[in-house]
Every structure is written in C-alpha cells, then in structure tokens.
C-alpha cells in the first residue's frame, strides 16, 4: 500500500499544494516564495527520506507568516494522511544533528496526541525574508495537524542559519525513524490498539 498524500489547502491568505511520499528517496521541490523556508523544506525531504513537492502562493506582500503557517499545516496533514492507520510503524524517532557549531535534538512520537516543546536560543530576527520566530510556529503547526508529539531542543549554536537548519535536519531524521515500517510490529504500535 502506497504511503502517499496530496493535500490542497486554500484560504483567503494562501493557496497550498503538498505532495508527500513517505517511502521516497529524498527528492524534494519547494516553491513558497520564501527562499530560506524552501531550503528548510528541502531538508525535511532529503533527511527524512521523503519525496516532497510543495507549491504555495501566499500574501507575501504582508509578510511570510500566513504562507509559512499554511504550508506547515498542509505538510502535517499530508504526513497524517500518508501514515494511514499507522500499522507496522516504529512510532518513535529521535535524532541529534550537528551543523558546524550548532547542535539540535529532536524526538517524535506519532501518538495521535499533538504536543510541541521547542527550546532554542534567541536568534537574529531575519534570515533573508524568513522571520526566525516562525521556526517554533512551523513545528507547532506540523504537530497540531499531524497529531504528533514533538520535542526540539537546540543544545548549542550561534549562527541563526545553522541553528534553524540543524533543527529541521534533526526533525527530519526523527520522523524518518518514526514512520519507518518495522517487520516486528504486528498491527498498531500501541497497547490502546489505536494511534
């Protein structure tokens, strides 16, 4: 059974298309109009081992908030849909990823219960047209729409680009492990029988 999803999200603020294949090869293509965010989405695809296509048109004449938020919601929805009933998955994943001086840790539980803990240092306000305060909101939006628990911590780092990118890579690697199929898991990986 293919673990894929195609999500279209249209609001008065944005028009989003996300296509996701959990069992891909890390091929990604993103065009949101926010170049640094596109770079981060590419990290999710590449290091998550997902094939990911994202096309967003948003109200960038205001700022990047709605574009980034709606894209993140659509990505989380695609992740939830592609997972289906979650039978046979590992469910949990964690990763610690360095990027030069930056070190980020992420842990995920595909529990069906959304909860996000995000700890990072104060960063310079902008990376190009990307507002660094959106990083937490991206992870919160993915968490809520995918219905997963996510913990992200920055353990060290000075360069804002490195700090944010290390977080996305860590989340990608944690998701890669959590969505992986495990032949030893029969059915739903929960004593409740549902996730």
Swiss-Prot record:
MF-aspect GO terms: imidazoleglycerol-phosphate dehydratase activity
Please name the CDD domains in this protein's record.
Answer: IGPD (cd07914)
- Point out the coiled-coil segments of this chain: none
The record's annotation in InterPro entries points to:
IGPD_sf, ImidazoleglycerolP_deHydtase, ImidazoleglycerP_deHydtase_CS, Ribosomal_Su5_D2-typ_SF
Pfam families of this UniProt entry? IGPD
Q: Pathway it belongs to?
A: Amino-acid biosynthesis; L-histidine biosynthesis; L-histidine from 5-phospho-alpha-D-ribose 1-diphosphate: step 6/9
Reaction catalyzed: D-erythro-1-(imidazol-4-yl)glycerol 3-phosphate = 3-(imidazol-4-yl)-2-oxopropyl phosphate + H2O
Q: Tell me, what is an example of a GO biological process annotation in this record?
A: L-histidine biosynthetic process
Enzyme Commission number: 4.2.1.19
User: Which key words tag this protein in UniProt?
Assistant: Amino-acid biosynthesis, Cytoplasm, Histidine biosynthesis, Lyase
User: PANTHER family attached here?
Assistant: IMIDAZOLEGLYCEROL-PHOSPHATE DEHYDRATASE, IMIDAZOLEGLYCEROL-PHOSPHATE DEHYDRATASE HIS7
The record ties this protein, via HAMAP family, to: HisB
Protein name, UniProt field:
Imidazoleglycerol-phosphate dehydratase
Q: Which organism does this sequence originate in? A: Frankia casuarinae (strain DSM 45818 / CECT 9043 / HFP020203 / CcI3)
Organism lineage reads as: Bacteria, Bacillati, Actinomycetota, Actinomycetes, Frankiales
Q: Which gene encodes it?
A: hisB
């Amino acid at each position: 059974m293919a673990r894929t999803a195609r999500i279209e999200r249209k609001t008065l603020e944005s028009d989003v298309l996300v296509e996701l294949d959990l069992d891909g090869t890390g091929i990604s293509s993103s065009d949101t109009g926010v170049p640094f965010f596109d770079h981060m989405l590419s990290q999710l695809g590449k290091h998550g081992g997902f094939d990911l296509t994202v096309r967003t048109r948003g109200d960038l004449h205001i700022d990047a908030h709605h574009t980034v938020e709606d894209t993140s919601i659509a990505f989380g929805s695609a992740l939830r849909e592609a997972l289906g009933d979650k039978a046979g998955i590992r469910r949990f994943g964690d990763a610690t990823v360095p990027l030069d001086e930056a070190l980020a840790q992420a842990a995920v539980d595909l529990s069906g219960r959304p909860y996000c803990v995000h700890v990072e240092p104060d960063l310079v306000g902008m990376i190009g047209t990307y507002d660094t305060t959106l990083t937490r909101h991206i992870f919160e939006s993915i968490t809520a729409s995918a219905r997963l628990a996510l913990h992200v911590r920055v353990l060290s780092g000075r360069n804002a680009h490195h700090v944010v990118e290390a977080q996305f890579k860590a989340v990608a690697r944690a998701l890669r492990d959590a969505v992986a199929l495990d032949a030893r898991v029969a059915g739903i990986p929960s004593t409740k029988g549902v996730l």
